[in-house]
Amino acid sequence: MENAKMNSLIAQYPLVKDLVALKETTWFNPGTTSLAEGLPYVGLTEQDVQDAHARLSRFAPYLAKAFPETAATGGIIESELVAIPAMQKRLEKEYQQPISGQLLLKKDSHLPISGSIKARGGIYEVLAHAEKLALEAGLLTLDDDYSKLLSPEFKQFFSQYSIAVGSTGNLGLSIGIMSARIGFKVTVHMSADARAWKKAKLRSHGVTVVEYEQDYGVAVEEGRKAAQSDPNCFFIDDENSRTLFLGYSVAGQRLKAQFAQQGRIVDADNPLFVYLPCGVGGGPGGVAFGLKLAFGDHVHCFFAEPTHSPCMLLGVHTGLHDQISVQDIGIDNLTAADGLAVGRASGFVGRAMERLLDGFYTLSDQTMYDMLGWLAQEEGIRLEPSALAGMAGPQRVCASVSYQQMHGFSAEQLRNTTHLVWATGGGMVPEEEMNQYLAKGR
């Protein structure tokens, strides 16, 4: 972006100056509305989410047999919800900032099959595509026991079709492992940020991995191009896919059920604050949409991004969405948080969700490494760097009197708050890689 344009952008949006300087930045969204007001802009409904629930239930008998690690939950891919009181104390001590309420962790980092939040959306979209093909071919009815999809006849049928996706790592893992298990031929286009072990794991499942020297945007574009030339190839579009988004959104009702089991209340007097790491936006956008449908105006969602990849904050704050990239303002999009190394946000998610998100913030790689170490020490839970992005949220919210006043929170409401950090990945990181992460924390 030339200087004159840049100066006028900064004049209009002074916060951009802090992003360019790679400062850890917090922006509380003045444009938030009620769910009733914001929902029509999403373009999806409660019914769409119910349909996704139903589809995952139809596939549960198949998943329970195809992936024995899901048998205990009857083929439902869901993660634990745990309190992390020792980490809460550690954060208060490190940042000299009390965190009112209770701190919880949602362990999507340890979801079965692929060990990340992408096991929600990625697996769901592959299943939705497989179902569509099998229904159209007359091989399946909605009332069948879907475990029949494990038969050689279905493997043979699906092998005529292929799936392609562009990814920084975790989405590729989910889609690659699931597609290969069903019998699809699958190609994952991986950006320069992708970890070597993620590529190796995919190849061990018989997935074709195409590597690029460039970032996520290039990998997605190349994947899209390659798929266009083959009528039997289905491209999973992380930037625009409504299906992926709905796969994530199922988490809302699931979390509501977990809260009920644990006797946790979410209402006007007991608000819920949720902190979601954000890359291109599909995962956190879908989860936030599901949470809003489940908890209404009593849930407040925040997106967390690396200082080197603040694409969603930049897009929503300026209103330019996918018309601007972090590279346009001179930011390099290089971060240890490989799952969040995205320079241009999803235009679909930004426009759909901008009224339903309370805020956005950035944090440095070093902050993620520090918190990764603290969580391992205090709670014995090991995550990958990007999964710690949400952990910086509670103290930002608790430190901001202006945010609290903007929403009219009383001291009592804040005392009764549940802070939920969404841990997005790390359960499958090899030990030597994890030790390198731990060594970088202070």
Curated annotation (Swiss-Prot):
Induction comment from the UniProt entry of this chain: By growth in D-serine.
User: Per its UniProt record, what Gene3D superfamilies does this chain match?
Assistant: 3.40.50.1100
Q: Which GO terms describe its cellular component?
A: cytoplasm; cytosol
An example GO BP is:
D-serine metabolic process
Q: Which reactions are catalysed by this chain? A: D-serine = pyruvate + NH4(+)
The answer on whether this UniProt entry bears the keyword Methyltransferase reads: no
Which cofactors does the annotated protein need, by name?
pyridoxal 5'-phosphate
Q: Which residues form the signal peptide?
A: none
Keyword presence, Lyase: yes
Cite a single Pfam family from the UniProt record. PALP
One molecular function GO term is: D-serine ammonia-lyase activity
Q: Which residues carry this modification: N6-(pyridoxal phosphate)lysine?
A: 118
Task: Provide the alphabetized UniProt keywords.
Answer: Lyase, Pyridoxal phosphate
Under which EC number(s) is this enzyme classified?
4.3.1.18
Which CDD domains has this protein been placed in? D-Ser-dehyd
Q: Describe the family membership recorded for this protein in Swiss-Prot or TrEMBL.
A: Belongs to the serine/threonine dehydratase family. DsdA subfamily.
Note on domains (UniProt): Crystal structures show a large (N-terminal) and small (C-terminal) domain; the C-terminal domain is mobile and can block access to the active site.
Complex formation: Monomer.
Name the record gives this protein? D-serine dehydratase
- Give the species this sequence originates from: Escherichia coli (strain K12)
